[in-house]
Structure formats: structure tokens, C-alpha cells
Amino acid sequence: MSARWTTAVLDPQITGGLAVARSPDGFLVDANGALFPRDWLKRQDLDVLCEHGIGHFDGQPVFLLELRSATDVPGCSWRGLRAFMLEGDFDTYKVLGYAAQIGTWAREHRFCGSCGQAMTQIRWERAMYCQPCDLRSYPRISPSMIVLVTRGDEILLARSPRFVTGVYSTLAGFAEPGESAEDCLVREVREEVAVEVQNIQYVGSQCWPFPHSMMLGFHAEYAGGDIVMQPDEIEDAQWFSVHDLPPLPAGRSIARYLIDLYVARRLGLPEPVLPR
């Protein structure tokens, strides 16, 4: 079965297709969702900052209209990306997640970071170009590790002050320059909870467009140490039995997948599938 959504660099000069409109308030939606006939959308009174061709959905070309600000459109409203992640069609969420990352990049790279002059959009490549500096800027992707640390029937979960009240999750952190994903994992676990790990195994990955992370998921076994929480980063961290877990992250997140996968294997239950 072919994928409903595939990314591609499309020339905005071509006509027709579908389009999504994104503002600082989220994506424009109506009763049918966030994908609109492009010609209709461009006839609306929208404050367009730029337009990018981003791919194909069900065989139709898709474009992003990145807006300077939200505009009232009759019969429509604005909806944040996280709401699409939590519910509705996951293929549509993938379109919007990609669009959000391209929109963030386009908004933040209008001017050259070296000389300050306006950059131009390259039509055949996903890049912005500064001619005086001969410099190309590509969409930013931030590699991050996320790990479930286990000890038999116990899993190590923590909560950040930024989490929804009561929710516990796996440990995670951004990779530093010159650092492998495994080195990042060991360092982040040590920094956040002062625990050592062993037998690191890669599990899977997930795009996390909030705003531009690539989450690399791992499982690791406890090797030693007592939990000492990192100030300002970790509000609480505990070992939880797979039989008695606290409130967990959203079901479509890789954090939840890592937890559900381990619990299923310990309890002999059907294994979950990571949304991609």
C-alpha cells in the first residue's frame, strides 16, 4: 500500500492542488479539516508571509501558506498542532507536522544569519539562499534521545514542571555537538536522575514537530545508582511497577509507545504499533 502522504519540493508557481494555512495561532480549519482547495484559500484575505510546496497527499500537490498573523475566515477557526496529534486522522497530522516545521524554518530564515540580507527561496531545493555569502540554510532538525530505563518489572519515570499535572514520562534530552545518541542517553540519564544504565537498545524514532525535534527512542537497563533529581528540570522521579503506573503521556507519542511496548512484553500482551 502506498503512503497517503509523501514530502516533495514543489514550485509554488504551479497551479491547483491543496493547501494549509498556518499562523501563530495554529492551522486554519473548517468542518472538513485543515486541507483546503488551494485556489479557494488564496482568494481569502490572508496575510501571507510566504508559500512553499511541501508534498503530495492522496496524489494531490499540497502547499503551505505561512501567515504573518491569524485572519478571521467565515466558517473557519484556528487550531493548534498538538490537537491534531491527539485526535483525528494521523496522516493529516503528518502533513501538518511537516508544514509546521517548514513554516517555522521559513519564518526564522528570511534573513541571512551572517550578513543580515534577505534570503531567497530556492525552487528546486528545500533551502533559503543568500547570494552575497553563497550560503544555504536548510530546515532545522534537532536530534533528541528518549529512553525508557527498566529494572525487571519496574520502569523509571519522571515528571518535569512543564508537564500536565500528574503525568509521568520517560527521560529525554537533546544531543550535544560531537555526541552520539548513545552518549547523549547516558549523559542525560546521569544528569537528570543520577542513574547509570547498560544494555542500550534502539527501539524506533518519531518526528516531534514542537518545533523541530527528531526523537530517537531507546530502551536501557538499570546499572546502578540512587535517584537524585536534577534541580529545575525534574520535579519528581520514581520507579513504578508495570502493574501500577501513573498517568502517562499521549497515546500517539513515542514516550507512550516505549512504555506500552515494555509493559506488553512483560505481561505477555499484544505489542503496540508506533505511529509513523
Curated annotation (Swiss-Prot):
<feature type="binding site">
    <location>
        <begin position="206"/>
        <end position="213"/>
    </location>
    <ligand>
        <name>substrate</name>
    </ligand>
</feature>
<keyword id="KW-0460">Magnesium</keyword>
<keyword id="KW-0520">NAD</keyword>
<dbReference type="GO" id="GO:0006742">
    <property type="term" value="P:NADP catabolic process"/>
</dbReference>
<keyword id="KW-0378">Hydrolase</keyword>
<comment type="subunit">
    <text>Homodimer.</text>
</comment>
<dbReference type="InterPro" id="IPR015376">
    <property type="entry name" value="Znr_NADH_PPase"/>
</dbReference>
<dbReference type="InterPro" id="IPR050241">
    <property type="entry name" value="NAD-cap_RNA_hydrolase_NudC"/>
</dbReference>
<feature type="binding site">
    <location>
        <position position="130"/>
    </location>
    <ligand>
        <name>Zn(2+)</name>
    </ligand>
</feature>
<feature type="binding site">
    <location>
        <position position="172"/>
    </location>
    <ligand>
        <name>a divalent metal cation 1</name>
    </ligand>
</feature>
<comment type="function">
    <text>mRNA decapping enzyme that specifically removes the nicotinamide adenine dinucleotide (NAD) cap from a subset of mRNAs by hydrolyzing the diphosphate linkage to produce nicotinamide mononucleotide (NMN) and 5' monophosphate mRNA. The NAD-cap is present at the 5'-end of some mRNAs and stabilizes RNA against 5'-processing. Has preference for mRNAs with a 5'-end purine. Catalyzes the hydrolysis of a broad range of dinucleotide pyrophosphates.</text>
</comment>
<dbReference type="InterPro" id="IPR049734">
    <property type="entry name" value="NudC-like_C"/>
</dbReference>
<feature type="binding site">
    <location>
        <position position="233"/>
    </location>
    <ligand>
        <name>a divalent metal cation 1</name>
    </ligand>
</feature>
<keyword id="KW-0479">Metal-binding</keyword>
<feature type="binding site">
    <location>
        <position position="125"/>
    </location>
    <ligand>
        <name>substrate</name>
    </ligand>
</feature>
<keyword id="KW-0464">Manganese</keyword>
<feature type="binding site">
    <location>
        <position position="255"/>
    </location>
    <ligand>
        <name>substrate</name>
    </ligand>
</feature>
<dbReference type="Pfam" id="PF00293">
    <property type="entry name" value="NUDIX"/>
</dbReference>
<dbReference type="InterPro" id="IPR022925">
    <property type="entry name" value="RNA_Hydrolase_NudC"/>
</dbReference>
<feature type="binding site">
    <location>
        <position position="115"/>
    </location>
    <ligand>
        <name>Zn(2+)</name>
    </ligand>
</feature>
<dbReference type="InterPro" id="IPR000086">
    <property type="entry name" value="NUDIX_hydrolase_dom"/>
</dbReference>
<dbReference type="GO" id="GO:0000287">
    <property type="term" value="F:magnesium ion binding"/>
</dbReference>
<keyword id="KW-0862">Zinc</keyword>
<dbReference type="Pfam" id="PF09297">
    <property type="entry name" value="Zn_ribbon_NUD"/>
</dbReference>
<feature type="short sequence motif" description="Nudix box">
    <location>
        <begin position="173"/>
        <end position="194"/>
    </location>
</feature>
<protein>
    <recommendedName>
        <fullName>NAD-capped RNA hydrolase NudC</fullName>
        <ecNumber>3.6.1.-</ecNumber>
        <ecNumber>3.6.1.22</ecNumber>
    </recommendedName>
</protein>
<dbReference type="GO" id="GO:0006734">
    <property type="term" value="P:NADH metabolic process"/>
</dbReference>
<feature type="binding site">
    <location>
        <position position="188"/>
    </location>
    <ligand>
        <name>a divalent metal cation 2</name>
    </ligand>
</feature>
<dbReference type="GO" id="GO:0005829">
    <property type="term" value="C:cytosol"/>
</dbReference>
<feature type="binding site">
    <location>
        <position position="112"/>
    </location>
    <ligand>
        <name>Zn(2+)</name>
    </ligand>
</feature>
<dbReference type="InterPro" id="IPR015375">
    <property type="entry name" value="NADH_PPase-like_N"/>
</dbReference>
<feature type="binding site">
    <location>
        <position position="133"/>
    </location>
    <ligand>
        <name>Zn(2+)</name>
    </ligand>
</feature>
<dbReference type="GO" id="GO:0008270">
    <property type="term" value="F:zinc ion binding"/>
</dbReference>
<dbReference type="GO" id="GO:0019677">
    <property type="term" value="P:NAD catabolic process"/>
</dbReference>
<feature type="binding site">
    <location>
        <position position="192"/>
    </location>
    <ligand>
        <name>a divalent metal cation 1</name>
    </ligand>
</feature>
<dbReference type="Pfam" id="PF09296">
    <property type="entry name" value="NUDIX-like"/>
</dbReference>
<dbReference type="GO" id="GO:0110153">
    <property type="term" value="F:RNA NAD-cap (NMN-forming) hydrolase activity"/>
</dbReference>
<dbReference type="GO" id="GO:0030145">
    <property type="term" value="F:manganese ion binding"/>
</dbReference>
<dbReference type="InterPro" id="IPR015797">
    <property type="entry name" value="NUDIX_hydrolase-like_dom_sf"/>
</dbReference>
<dbReference type="GO" id="GO:0035529">
    <property type="term" value="F:NADH pyrophosphatase activity"/>
</dbReference>
<feature type="binding site">
    <location>
        <position position="188"/>
    </location>
    <ligand>
        <name>a divalent metal cation 3</name>
    </ligand>
</feature>
<feature type="binding site">
    <location>
        <position position="233"/>
    </location>
    <ligand>
        <name>a divalent metal cation 3</name>
    </ligand>
</feature>
